């Protein structure tokens, strides 16, 4: 940008180019400084140490003119580039050794930034800042006693009363997760105080509740790898680090090369730091469960993978997560950065990368980034390391398949999405015969179900015959059905069916581009099987009318999605009239299913379109999904895809109206502000009137939409409770094992609803607790609600 300005200036003919170039020079220098700081630590012909020394010299020379800019850049990289933490702490250490006042200003700026992050709930960035400050102790910028004092304030949060556990968790995590970097230094200077802090931490960890853990575990079984709660795992890693005399072997520590310079520098005390009090607006990070997939036995020939309670494992995983967070929008850069991770010859890097990517993909309640990003990232990694990474990925896929029986249903969904998408990029090549064990199992068991859903998804990304061709003939029982329309009026043998003649008339009329009125006229004579006298012009709920019309229209529009959408749009008025009642809406959905039961994707897109065009509403879709007609497909992937899409639409609708209300209130506030500087109060009053009326109308719309939203969740939870209770009673009276594949799927789908829509559900918790999740409910079902409540407790 600056180069373009320079060239434009030189073309000026008014004799001012030099003057204008000089005024743009500061911005060019600022851009250069930013580039130098951001790029330090990347691959270079020179050593990191000489680059840091050179950069420190450049920055020191520019401090008189660009101090505030340099401070701002350094604070930003401390927050946003944690994978280069020790590079930047060393740089700050060198600057502090050269300019003590700058070091003090930097520490104060970091504390201000930390307070601001905590104030606006940016807790992940705040952890990076705390770690950065702690590593400045190693660089002789911050005095160890003042860092210990800050950690004492952190740990004291666990003594606060009436605060959520997740608040205490965050402060304990911020303290413990800094110790791999600074534990040795703090212990050498303040061993008694550190022992006391660790003792208080242990006491807190022993008394904290862990009801939430089952809801967040990827697997229900702890073999071969325990699925530990994140603070428990970190505590074990810190305990081992302490036992090893705080010797950590993986963190890059460039400041050691400058020890003779840094140890001469004067140190700063941190300003007193009191954790901001808990408020209603505080939103703390949710607890996590640590994902484990590999250990040292999985790569016997390469470097040894650190153990799960080794602090090196924590450091490697943290850094890889940070790299993904910094570069996730650019898959090529992200893949290259992951593969050039420092010390990659000392660790089985490919195994660590694959494990970390799957840890994020399977993270509950939701991955940190959109799911498709992980697919594209793994494809990019396979391209960059074609000789090794695809083999590790295949090994991981095999492990995931083998552990499907105990895998969380939400994670199975993500596994299906990832694997089918991945296969589509590699000509759908896979050694399907290796999974032939699934063919001897009950089709409702996790393995055959997984293979069936993967092939179904692959068909969406290809076409039916291709999928039939790629899998062995023995897998035909799991192969997707031919996605053709089932039109019951198309066969002459069905002439005796009620409505057959009307269907023929409709077919001719629609082909001849009939209007809505003409369609109404044809449908008028269809008898209503639900009543003897059709005395209301024939447009109340008439299942036969709906059946004949919807069957015929969808059959004629079956060629493509766009043909079907056009048909819905053209005959929207007919749909709205026929589906005016709740029963009508439900029956429209039933007929859609009858016609397209062999094409789940078509069902999903048609239902989506019908909600958007208000032919059916969200509550009707929820009731349809839990109806007996869909019992056969209840555990199928597409059913839950439809339900979650329906809930998201409702949530977006509420948010949209709420935003309109807030925008209108803001406009009124701006008008009032203008009135204060305006003499004509009467004209202002006239302007206020319409806005105030609009706000009133929007408030009513928001309340109505929120009521619909709450009702949708009530319907869903009520139907879950009914289905699960029936199953539990049936098993109890029949002496059958409760934990069937159907039960596992159903109870985990209930968990999925809570987790995927947790922010919305939190708003209505009191209602749900009072009306549905009462103490009388079976403990199997109530446990899910209690686990959910514990997530933010």
UniProtKB/Swiss-Prot annotation:
Composition bias, Basic and acidic residues: 683-692
One GO location term (cellular component): nuclear cap binding complex
Keywords: Coiled coil, Cytoplasm, mRNA capping, mRNA processing, mRNA splicing, mRNA transport, Nonsense-mediated mRNA decay, Nucleus, RNA-mediated gene silencing, Translation regulation, Transport
InterPro entries for this protein: ARM-type_fold (IPR016024), CBP80 (IPR027159), MIF4G-like_typ-1 (IPR015172), MIF4G-like_typ-2 (IPR015174), MIF4G-like_typ-3 (IPR003890)
GO biological process, one term: regulation of translational initiation
Coiled coil feature spans: 686-716
Subcellular location: Nucleus; Cytoplasm
Annotated GO MF terms: mRNA binding; RNA cap binding
SUPFAM superfamilies on file: ARM repeat
Location of the region described as Disordered in the Swiss-Prot/TrEMBL record: 1-30, 668-692
Protein family according to the UniProt entry: Belongs to the NCBP1 family.
Subunit: Component of the nuclear cap-binding complex (CBC), a heterodimer composed of NCBP1/CBP80 and NCBP2/CBP20 that interacts with m7GpppG-capped RNA. Component of an alternative nuclear cap-binding complex (CBC) composed of NCBP1/CBP80 and NCBP3.
Protein name from the UniProt record: Nuclear cap-binding protein subunit 1
Organism this protein belongs to: Gallus gallus
Gene that produces this protein: NCBP1
């Amino acid at each position: 940008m600056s180069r373009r300005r320079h060239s434009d200036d030189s073309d000026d003919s008014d004799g001012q180019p030099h003057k204008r170039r000089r005024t743009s020079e500061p911005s060019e220098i600022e851009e250069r400084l930013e580039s130098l700081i951001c790029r330090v630590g990347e691959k270079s012909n020179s050593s990191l140490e000489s680059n840091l020394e050179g950069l420190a010299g450049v920055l020191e020379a520019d401090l008189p003119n660009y101090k505030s800019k340099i401070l701002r850049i350094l604070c930003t990289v401390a927050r946003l580039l944690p994978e280069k933490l020790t590079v930047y702490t060393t740089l700050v250490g060198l600057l502090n050794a050269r300019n003590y006042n700058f070091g003090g200003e930097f520490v104060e700026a970091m504390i201000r930034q930390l307070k601001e992050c905590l104030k606006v709930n940016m807790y992940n960035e705040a952890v990076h800042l705390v770690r950065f400050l702690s590593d400045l102790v190693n660089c002789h910028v911050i005095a160890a006693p003042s860092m210990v004092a800050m950690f004492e304030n952190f740990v004291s949060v666990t003594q606060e009363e009436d605060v959520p556990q997740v608040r205490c968790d965050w402060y304990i995590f911020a303290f413990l997760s800094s110790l791999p970097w600074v534990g040795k230094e703090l212990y050498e200077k303040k061993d008694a105080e550190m022992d006391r802090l660790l003792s208080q931490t242990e006491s807190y960890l022993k008394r904290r509740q862990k009801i939430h853990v089952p809801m967040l575990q990827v697997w229900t079984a702890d073999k071969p790898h325990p699925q530990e709660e994140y603070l428990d795992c970190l505590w074990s890693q810190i305990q081992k680090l302490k036992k090893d005399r705080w010797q950590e072997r993986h963190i890059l520590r460039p400041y050691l090369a400058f020890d003779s310079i840094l140890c001469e520098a004067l140190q700063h005390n941190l300003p007193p730091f009191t954790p901001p009090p808990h408020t209603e607006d505080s939103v703390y990070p949710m607890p996590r469960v640590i994902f484990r997939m590999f250990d040292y036995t999985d790569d016997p020939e390469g470097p040894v993978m650190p153990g799960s309670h080794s602090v090196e494992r924590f450091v490697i995983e943290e850094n890889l997560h940070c790299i993904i967070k910094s570069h996730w929008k650019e898959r090529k850069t992200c893949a290259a950065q992951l593969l050039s991770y420092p010390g990659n010859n000392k660790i089985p890097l490919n195994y660590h990368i694959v494990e970390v990517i799957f840890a994020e993909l399977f993270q509950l309640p939701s991955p940190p980034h959109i799911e498709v990003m992980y697919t594209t990232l793994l494809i990019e990694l396979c391209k960059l390391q074609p000789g090794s990474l695809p083999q590790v990925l295949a090994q991981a896929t095999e492990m995931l398949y083998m552990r499907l029986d105990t895998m969380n249903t939400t994670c199975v969904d993500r596994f299906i999405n990832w694997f089918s998408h991945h296969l589509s990029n590699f000509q759908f090549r896979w050694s399907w015969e290796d999974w032939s064990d699934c063919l001897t199992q009950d089709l409702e068991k996790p393995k055959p179900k997984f293979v069936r859903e993967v092939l179904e998804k692959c068909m969406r990304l290809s076409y039916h015959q291709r999928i039939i061709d790629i899998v062995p003939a023995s897998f035909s029982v799991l192969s997707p059905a031919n996605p053709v329309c089932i039109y019951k009026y198309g066969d002459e043998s069905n002439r005796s069916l009620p409505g057959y003649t009307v269907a023929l008339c409709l077919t001719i009329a629609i082909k001849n581009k009939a209007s809505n009125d003409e369609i109404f006229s044809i449908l008028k004579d269809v008898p209503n099987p639900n009543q003897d006298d059709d005395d209301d012009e024939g447009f109340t709920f008439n299942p036969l009318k709906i059946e004949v019309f919807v069957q015929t229209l969808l059959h004629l529009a079956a060629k493509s999605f766009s043909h079907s959408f056009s048909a819905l749009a053209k005959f929207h008025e007919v749909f709205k009239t026929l589906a005016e009642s709740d029963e009508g809406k439900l029956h429209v959905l039933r007929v859609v299913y009858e016609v397209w039961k062999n094409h789940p994707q078509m069902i999903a897109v048609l239902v989506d379109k019908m909600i958007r065009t208000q032919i059916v509403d969200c509550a009707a879709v929820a009731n349809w999904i839990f109806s007996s007609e869909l019992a056969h497909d209840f555990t199928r992937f597409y059913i839950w895809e439809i339900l979650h899409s329906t809930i998201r639409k409702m949530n977006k609708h509420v948010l949209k109206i709420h935003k309109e209300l807030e925008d209108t209130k803001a406009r009124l506030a701006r008008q009032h502000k203008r009135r204060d500087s305006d003499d004509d109060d009467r004209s202002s009053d006239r302007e206020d009137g319409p806005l105030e009326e609009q706000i009133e109308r929007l408030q009513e719309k928001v309340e109505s939409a929120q009521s619909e939203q709450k009702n949708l969740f009530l319907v869903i939870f009520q139907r879950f409770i009914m289905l699960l209770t029936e199953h539990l009673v049936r098993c109890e009276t029949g002496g059958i094992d409760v934990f069937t594949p159907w039960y596992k799927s159903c109870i985990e789908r209930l968990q999925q609803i809570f987790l995927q829509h947790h922010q919305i559900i939190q708003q209505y918790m009191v209602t749900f607790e009072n009306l549905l999740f009462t103490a009388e409910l079976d403990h199997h079902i109530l446990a899910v609600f209690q686990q959910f409540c514990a997530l933010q407790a």
